[in-house]
Amino acid sequence: MAVNNSHRKNQLITYLFNYAYDHDIGYIFFESDPNNPSLSFKNEREICINMNWHHHSPEVPFTIAHEIGHIMDGKLNLKQYNCCLDYGGFDDEERDADIYGLHLIYQYSCAQEDNFYDPAAFIQSYAISEKMIKEAYKMFEDEGEFFYIGRSKIHN
């Protein structure tokens, strides 16, 4: 996805919106100022996605997955709404949404039979924020389908 592959990006976006629909999450997507973040309303089970985030950034799919994560985390809503300005930056709630989004995109990747064996390649291919690299390594290790030489770990 980091490569300019709009068809693949659009397929992932479609998957994520279908996932939201299947989980009773309403969504609004809009184009606004590139600096206006996406947000979620937990009580209403609704996400609002700025499709012009950083001028149509390849990270838009991760933004969608992240906002879905806010709704799906099952925790009591302590805020009126969740507004994400910087992935992995604010608090545990933002971090949990990042992790949910990472796992959701990984689930999609597996369904596509992408067969990533390197977490860094997965992150890059799906334009996931590099702040998620440590969590991606942990996720790959937990999944037991680890095959990367960088740290001398090889699992099959």
How would you name each of these model-derived features?
Residues 1-156:
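Active-site hotspot residues in diverse enzymes, especially metal/ion-binding acidic/histidine motifs
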